[in-house]
Design a protein with these regions (language model features):
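C-terminal lobe helix-coil module of Hanks-type protein kinase domains
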Residues: 1-27
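Short, ordered coil/turn segments that flank beta-strands lining enzyme active or ligand-binding pockets
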Residues: 5, 137-139, 197, 455, ...
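Residue-level recognition of oxygen-bearing side chains
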Residues: 14, 325, 359, 461, ...
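Post-kinase regulatory C-tail/linker adjacent to protein kinase catalytic domains
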Residues: 29-42
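Acidic, proline/glycine-rich low-complexity intrinsically disordered segments
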Residues: 39-411, 415, 419, 424, ...
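Amphipathic alpha-helical protein-interaction segments enriched in hydrophobic
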Residues: 409-414, 443-454, 478
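TPR/TPR-like (Sel1-like) alpha-helical repeat modules
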Residues: 467-474, 503
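Terminal, low-structured helical/coil segments at or just beyond the last alpha-helical repeat
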Residues: 480-505
Length: 505
């Protein structure tokens, strides 16, 4: 293999594509067929250089140590993802097996990996006992197993030992820069690290109270180590989602998200996740489409296996109307994280805004079949049904979204739009009253009122509320160029002017 990084294949799928192309070429006269590479053997070798890191089991006396077990697995995933020769299953896909009694070979088959790392943690005070096993998916035998009886202060040494042992047993060749990245510690403060793990644990629950608790822990981590880039990124991601899900007014949320992202990149310029978050901010708050694309492409270039960067870039492409590219990019995210429900869900969104409603419905029904609790899939499925005037299914589906989301503003507003679109005017007006009541103890964006008025056919009220949403800089307004629900406004001068102000004309 080439020693110079720029001449090497950077990902396993690039190797596969090249080999398949070579295999399709018939040897020319005078060239021995024996010189054509044995594609099957080389593809098998590439498959063996792939791994899933399952969440470590919690054997601690205190069951609240779950956050530490999840965090340890996630940190090992992050370390291994810096190795260009190794394909690492995304966290969300690996964590789909959490708490399930499933054969390792089945895990390997579902995630298309050649090896699986599993383990357990027993934590008592400052004492740790960590066990780890590296299993060959092909035959189920252990390639390696180890036990670490250490103090909490040694956690970073343990992570490095496990990561480098995997490199050794999978016979991977590390570039100097890759090894440096594995050994580079985000913090030397184990108390800050512990706070960060707690923050991510609650953040990953993806609901308002979880975001708020996560934010507290990220802030504690920074108090203990101001130079902890990942903790700054945690704050950025938290405020980004609080703004995006309308839990906070945009002006409050996004400026804090941007400041924290820039701080994270200042500390660690190679942090792909921070670049992606800056793209997220440029897209949802700044409405700076050129900057957003640049940030996403930088994140993908820095970390090609980062499925979220591909997903967010695909979402960006759908918002600006580049539908075919959007679906293609989201499919890349799905390939990298096949068990993450948000990936096929946003494929469904992209099909919906591309007016491919039947395909969207098929895609989203499959998501719900595999994960009936994944709330956002019900929103996009309902929207696709309503676009086809399937009023009954649309209303029932959005009612399920309201239930699963805990009566979120987004869900309640969409129920009002569904009632109005189906001609159920009285029910839609009651939803407007319900939004007024909700606004007494939570933020209710003007766009969500506009959606109900739009369903009622009251264009003037809808446009007035869209104007307020622009002044409030509500993030979801970024979608109006392509959102089918707003098609009835496209000939309106005020709507055209709004698109122009957002650089979406």
């Amino acid at each position: 293999m080439e020693k110079e990084k720029e001449k090497r294949y950077q990902r396993v799928d690039e190797i596969q594509s090249a080999l398949l192309a070579m295999a399709s070429v018939t040897p020319t006269a005078g060239i021995a067929a024996a010189k054509v590479p044995d594609t099957k053997k080389i593809l098998e070798a590439a498959w063996k250089k792939s791994i899933a890191v399952l969440p470590f089991s919690n054997l601690s006396p205190e069951k609240e140590q779950e956050y530490f077990c999840d965090g340890l697995s996630e940190e090992i995933i992050n370390a291994l993802s810096h190795i260009g020769e190794l394909r690492v299953a995304a966290r969300t896909s690996a964590f789909a097996f959490k708490g399930k009694d499933i054969d390792i070979r089945e895990v390997g088959e579902k995630l298309n990996v050649g090896a699986v790392l599993e383990g357990s943690v027993r934590k008592s005070g400052q004492r740790l006992r960590i066990t780890a096993q590296l299993v060959n998916v092909e035959d189920g035998y252990h390639l390696w197993s180890g036990q670490f009886d250490r103090e909490m202060k040694d956690i970073f040494d343990i992570q490095e030992e496990i990561s480098l042992t995997i490199v050794d047993h999978l016979k991977l060749k590390l570039l100097k820069s890759e090894k440096e990245r594995i050994l580079k510690r985000a913090t030397e403060n184990h108390e800050a690290y512990d706070c960060y793990l707690k923050g991510r644990y609650f953040w990953n629950r993806r609901y308002e109270k979880g975001f708020q608790r996560g934010l507290q822990y990220f802030q504690q981590a920074i108090e203990k180590d101001p130079g902890y880039a990942l903790a700054h990124l945690g704050i950025a991601d938290t405020f980004g989602y609080l703004g995006n899900f309308s839990f906070l007014p945009s002006h409050q949320a996004w400026s804090r998200a941007e400041a924290a992202s820039k701080k994270a990149l200042e500390i660690d310029p190679e942090l792909a996740e921070a670049s992606a978050t800056l793209g997220w901010i440029a897209m949802w708050y700044d409405w700076d489409w050129t900057a957003a694309e640049g940030h996403y492409l930088k994140a993908i270039q820095t970390k090609p296996e980062y499925d979220t960067a591909h997903l967010w870039y695909g979402l960006y492409l759908s918002i600006v109307g580049r539908f075919d590219e959007s679906i293609q990019e989201m499919q890349k995210a799905r390939e990298l994280a096949p068990l993450e429900p948000v990936n096929p869900t946003l494929v469904g969104w992209a099909l919906y805004v591309a007016r491919r409603f039947d395909e969207a419905i098929g895609e989203l029904r499959k998501v719900i079949e595999s994960d009936p609790q994944f709330a956002i899939a019900y929103w996009y499925l309902a929207a696709s049904c309503l676009a086809k005037k399937m009023w009954g299914e649309g209303i029932v589906t959005i009612q399920k979204f309201v239930e699963l989301s805990g009566e979120s503003v987004i869900a309640v507003s969409n129920l009002g739009y569904a009632y109005a679109s189906a001609g159920m005017r009285d029910e839609a007006l009651k939803i407007l009253e319900r939004l007024d009541r909700l606004s007494k103890d939570r933020y209710v964006g003007s766009l969500w009122r506009a959606a109900v008025y739009l369903g009622l056919g009251e264009k003037n009220e809808a446009l007035e509320n869209l104007g307020k949403a622009y002044l409030e800089r509500e993030s979801i307004l970024a979608c109006i160029k392509v959102w089918p629900a707003f098609d009835s406004l496209r000939s309106e001068p005020r709507f055209k002017a709004l698109l122009k102000k957002m650089n979406l004309d």
